[in-house]
Amino acid sequence: MTRIKICGLKRPEDVEYVNQYLPDYVGFVFAESKRKVTDAQAEELSGKLDKKIISVGVFVNEPAEHVIKLVKKGIIRMVQLHGDEDAEYILKLRENLEETAKIIKAVRVQCREQILEAEKLPCDYLLLDTWQKGAY
């Protein structure tokens, strides 16, 4: 089944658009980016989201405590990791979050072996991404 995620919401009008079209997921970027949001911005925007839409926090090497706080406050309902987060980091999230908070791990791959290794991670979904030196 195809699922749709629109990422990088930052403005109130972005929420108006997604509420009209109802994608499955929307992403709030907490990593360094021109689309980065603060906790307060994400809280305000997620509060206006249609409840059918699952909010996803996108992170790169973020302290686990910050991710956990955002989920527990209900600002995000799903976690997408794009950095160097390993199995230990993911397990720490799992220990502190409800089962309903799914975890996506993005893995930058260059070869088949990296995909096979990534399959061992304790995440709910793998997102295979293009490998580019120094980029997440």
Residue ranges and their predicted role:
Residues 1-136:
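Conserved N-terminal beta1-alpha1 strand-loop-helix module at the mouth
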